Amino acid sequence: MSYPRTLEVLARLHVDPHFREAWRRDAPGALTPLGLTPPEAEALQRVAPDVVERAGRMMDFHRTERVREQLAWVDEAKRPELVPLRARFLQDVPPEVLNREEAIAYCRFLEAGEHAPHAKLLQRLPAYVPQLARCERLRLQLAWGLAPMPASGPRVESFDYPVLTLLAALDAPGWPPVAPKPTCVEYLKVPNLPAVMTRELPSP
């Protein structure tokens, strides 16, 4: 038996909800396209379903906590409308290696437009949520050097809503009602630290 190949399939059962569900419904059918040897396939078919399910739940919990660590406002106790979006994110988006990368991926998921597969779920949220997600994604990317800063001075981005004011208001439960208001946000990199300072500027 090829340990690397078997471990690869076990890892996929751990992290891939689509594959895990296919294996749960029909293990031989899910394994057939993978080109496993008969002993490998037979061994993987004998894995206890409850073990696979438990490992999947642990992975989903771990990914969820990684996002929450970076994005405090992604709090389903305060905003239960995010629950189905989290489930869809875990199902559709492969896991990332680092916490910040997981949070950036979640921001991109929330930024997706009307043609995204999960667009109907996004439509249940306030219109400003994609703007919040973009603001937070840029904060993380700029802090960790994953997006370019100007050669000197801050980076300034335009938004359709007062996103920093909104983020502060999200300490309270629910979604605050906020009208569109063109706003600029200044991102200033903190030297030698994975951080940026942000402030809202009057729109020109």
Kindly label every feature range from the protein language model.
Residues 86-203:
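Hydrophobic packing positions characteristic
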Residues 1-75, 80, 111:
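Terminal, compositionally biased segments used for targeting/anchoring and flexible tails
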Residues 76-78, 82, 96-99:
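Surface-exposed acidic/polar loop and edge beta-strand patches at domain peripheries
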